[in-house]
Swiss-Prot record:
Pfam families documented for this protein: MinE
Family of this protein: Belongs to the MinE family.
UniProt keyword annotation of Protease present: no
Keywords from the UniProt entry: Cell cycle, Cell division
GO biological process: cell division; regulation of division septum assembly
Gene: minE
Annotated disulfide bonds: none
Matches recorded under NCBIfam families: minE, PRK00296.1
Function: Prevents the cell division inhibition by proteins MinC and MinD at internal division sites while permitting inhibition at polar sites. This ensures cell division at the proper site by restricting the formation of a division septum at the midpoint of the long axis of the cell.
Name recorded for this polypeptide: Cell division topological specificity factor
Length: 91
């Protein structure tokens, strides 16, 4: 009963465990994909620049990560869209 109370009052242990697990997955994916953190950051910036030409993004919810299974490493972008920008004439 007391343990349940502590678990409810201090649930961060599970969250921190999940955070560590996600960080480890990211490090492993970086190693397997041979992407440096600097290159990943540059890719992130360029992706955001291109997407921002067409839509307004919610910067708080943005997330870019590498996910890895046994065969494939995937770059996953979660980019919350606030609104689509009006079409502009490009030359």
């Amino acid at each position: 009963m007391l343990a349940d109370l502590f678990e409810r009052l201090f649930p961060r242990q599970q969250a921190s465990r999940d955070t560590v697990k996600q960080r480890l997955k990211l490090v492993l994916a970086h190693d397997r994909a041979d992407l440096s953190p600097e290159l990943l950051q540059k890719m992130r910036q360029e992706i955001l620049e291109v997407v921002s030409r067409y839509v307004e993004l919610d910067s708080e919810g943005m997330e870019l990560s590498l996910e890895n299974d046994q065969r494939v490493t995937a770059l996953v972008a979660n980019l919350p869209i606030r609104r689509v920008k009006p079409a502009t004439a490009e030359g």
